[in-house]
């Protein structure tokens, strides 16, 4: 079974041809698409897209709801409550995309850690898997995950591009690993090719 676990389907580039994209995916043998929520607004949008296209594509569309580390600075008192409400939708299968990204720091590391831990607590409370993002922050992310792992039902590190040490750290926590297209890139994917 082919499942695309990280579909940024609310992006405006799909505004004109969402139905055709879904048809092509189905025709190519992709049985399930998990639409990624990266902010409160994007989480609302992907849940709405699941409802909008769910009748035409039954049992194909699912969603995550969460706040990406780039958007962690937007976390406020209402954010987690809205995510909790969205997570009650039957199409929602995970909390995230969450984690740490110290590569560009669109949000400060402290803001990212606060948002990450708030979402881990929500996932543990709701007993939903977590959909993780990490870039240049493996040591700290693993440290935080070790604190929460026993309370989480499941987790996947989406779009893994890290080192052997990071990979083994995630596997030691019994996390699933999502492989990115970088594995096919001779310049960026050489180390990743060896790990796969």
Please report, for each region that a protein language model flagged, where it lies by residue.
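Mid-domain alpha/beta scaffold segments of enzyme catalytic cores
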Residues: 1-196
